[in-house]
Amino acid sequence: DPLTVAHATRMLLKDLRSFAHPRWTQTGFRRAHGSEAQGTTMRNLFGQVDGTVNAQSGTDDFDELVWAREGWIAGGTSMVVRRIHMDLDRWDRLDRSGREQAVGRTLANGAPLTGVNERDEPDSAATTPIGFPVIPEFSHLRRARSDDRTQRIVRRGRRGPPATSRAAST
């Protein structure tokens, strides 16, 4: 609810006035609570499911990834904000196959290109009849997954309004 978020933001900023001041702000949004069934993976502005393999809150996997166990941050966590430009006009020019190849998942339900359902384990060794990987090595799915536990993170994507372009206004 944008009204609730605006009020909470104002209260936080008001209470921090004597300690800090904002350097920049970023508007973002997710689906409103209750607008989708529990456990539904959100979609990004490209229309792709986003965050399928994130560790789920309340699990040992989540706790291991999020909560520091030692050092100055023991019992705490950290956060990185990364702003990613999404070129929606260029994305619109890709056909369905190109979009699915770029992400490594189907548009319809987010299943890996080697699976049927969103949470199916992708088969990285599967190849096409002419020997190309079914899930391309450049795909988001391959690049975002790692077997090295030290490279795993929990992502909490927020969507911002897309920039208006000439293509969108004509």
Located regions from the model:
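Long, histidine/aromatic-enriched segments associated with O2/redox biology
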Residues: 1-170
